């Protein structure tokens, strides 16, 4: 019933939101029926999931947000998709990504207001979860591609520590920075997903009842608007009143150049990882992407 409800929601809203680049309803329903007949064997049994279209899927096209790869069919699943299948998840389809998970946006609109951006690069995954098309969607982050669209669309975005989730079978942009993440609608849903991927229970976390949270204003704090600063200060006060230990984090002066360093690493490694596309399909790349390598 959950999978059918998600598909019905997609039929109603996809023309307005544009979260999906590939959707196979028959295949999704076949997976769901197989889950209904089978004994639950995984922590995500029967849960519908959207997959960002830079993760390889053996039974669905993977286009990486580029016309260069239109109709491209990988032979194998990415490591993440393979895990999801083994955990019992139903793969509904592929969600819209920006071109190679970088700057050029796709068709996705913000589900709360079509005149607003959903954020990128994991646009479709964030918008699909926000619009109740799917309860869980996978994204990636090289700069802010999970936490930004999660914020813009009003959902929970989870970007784990770099290297905790395998990026095998994910089209690389910057191999020193690329990180898998996910979108859900609540902290409780995130807890379930976290337990599924790491097979860890809350009881195994000794500091769970009294977490410590670092509050870091960063060198860019003054660039934030008053409403943003007030929201963060309010969150700090709320956490503190609930027994959370708040630790003020002061970054060394050297961290003020971190953003520029990140940009240099990202552009350099993207040039390496997109060398084939730049050499053989230059005209099919967006002007915006080409401009990064013509400076």
Walk through the language-model features, giving the residues of each.
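Short glycine/serine-rich loop segments
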Residues: 76-194
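Short, well-ordered alpha-helical
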Residues: 1-73, 101-102, 232
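Charged, often glycine-rich, active-site loop that binds/positions anionic groups
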Residues: 106-113, 258-273
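Conserved core segment of the aminotransferase class I/II
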Residues: 187-198, 271-276
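Short, well-ordered beta-strand elements within core beta-sheets of diverse protein domains
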Residues: 50, 68-72, 178-185, 293-295
């Amino acid at each position: 019933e959950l999978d059918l409800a998600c598909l019905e929601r997609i039929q109603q809203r996809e023309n307005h939101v544009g979260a999906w680049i590939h959707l196979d309803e028959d295949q999704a329903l076949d997976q769901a029926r197989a889950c209904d007949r089978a004994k639950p064997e995984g922590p995500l049994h029967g849960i519908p999931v959207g997959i960002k279209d830079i993760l390889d899927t053996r039974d669905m096209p993977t286009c990486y947000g580029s016309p260069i790869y239109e109709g491209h069919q990988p032979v194998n699943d990415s490591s993440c998709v393979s895990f999801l299948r083994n955990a019992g998840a139903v793969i509904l389809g592929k969600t819209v990504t920006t071109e190679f998970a970088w700057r050029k946006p796709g068709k996705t609109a913000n589900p709360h207001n079509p005149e607003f951006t959903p954020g990128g690069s994991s646009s479709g995954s964030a918008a699909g979860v926000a619009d109740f098309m799917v309860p869980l969607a996978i994204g990636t982050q090289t700069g802010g591609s999970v936490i930004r669209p999660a914020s813009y669309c009003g959902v929970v975005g989870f970007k784990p520590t770099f290297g905790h989730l395998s990026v095998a079978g994910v089209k690389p942009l910057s191999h020193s920075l690329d990180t898998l993440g996910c979108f859900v609608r609540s902290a409780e849903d995130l807890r379930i997903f976290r337990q599924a991927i790491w097979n860890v229970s809350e009881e195994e976390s000794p500091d769970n009842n009294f977490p410590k949270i670092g509050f870091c204003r960063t060198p860019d704090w003054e660039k934030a608007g008053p409403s943003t600063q007030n929201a963060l200060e309010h969150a700090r006060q709320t956490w503190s009143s609930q027994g959370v230990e708040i630790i003020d984090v002061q970054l060394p002066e050297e961290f003020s150049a971190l953003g520029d360093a990140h940009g240099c690493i990202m552009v350099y490694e993207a040039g390496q990882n997109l060398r084939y596309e730049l050499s053989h399909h230059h005209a099919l790349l967006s002007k915006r992407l080409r401009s990064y390598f013509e400076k």
